[in-house]
Amino acid sequence: MDSILTHTRLRWIARILSLALFFLWGAFFLEHLSWFQSFVTEPPPLMVWVMQLAHLTLLLGYLFAWRSERVAVLMILIGAGIFFPFVGGPNAWWYGLTAIVPAIFFFLAWRSEPEQ
């Protein structure tokens, strides 16, 4: 019984953290849209498109946490792994670790899953 409760709690913690991080990193996503401000006169470089796509992948991963946990974890890890090393600057490790916390909780939940 205890492992079932632990498993369920860890999954809910991961989902709630995903929602909170969706809003946190979503605000930065909206702010990064300013990179496209001069789109009409001069389109942004390819790297800007790639980084924005990686950021969007991260955000979609947070939303997928409510539907498909394994897909969510994959999207969160890919999005964070591509986005933060290039955009995070000297704090990239901290940003990346913060971003993948829901994935860590999902891994812990899967490890605590009761034997069937």
Model-found features: residue ranges?
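Membrane-helix interface "capping/anchor" motifs
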Residues: Y62-L74
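Alpha-helical transmembrane segments and their immediate juxtamembrane flanks
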Residues: H7-L17, F23, F36-Q37, W93-Q116
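Alpha-helical transmembrane segments of polytopic membrane proteins
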Residues: L46-H55, W94-A99
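Hydrophobic, membrane-inserted alpha-helices
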Residues: H55-Y62, I76-F84
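Short, Lys/Arg-rich, polar N-terminal cytosolic tail immediately upstream
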Residues: M1-H7
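Aromatic-anchored segments of alpha-helical transmembrane domains
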Residues: L21-L30, L77-N91
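Membrane-interface helix termini and inter-helical loops of multi-pass transporters
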Residues: L33-P44
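Membrane-helix interface motif
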Residues: L30-W35, V71
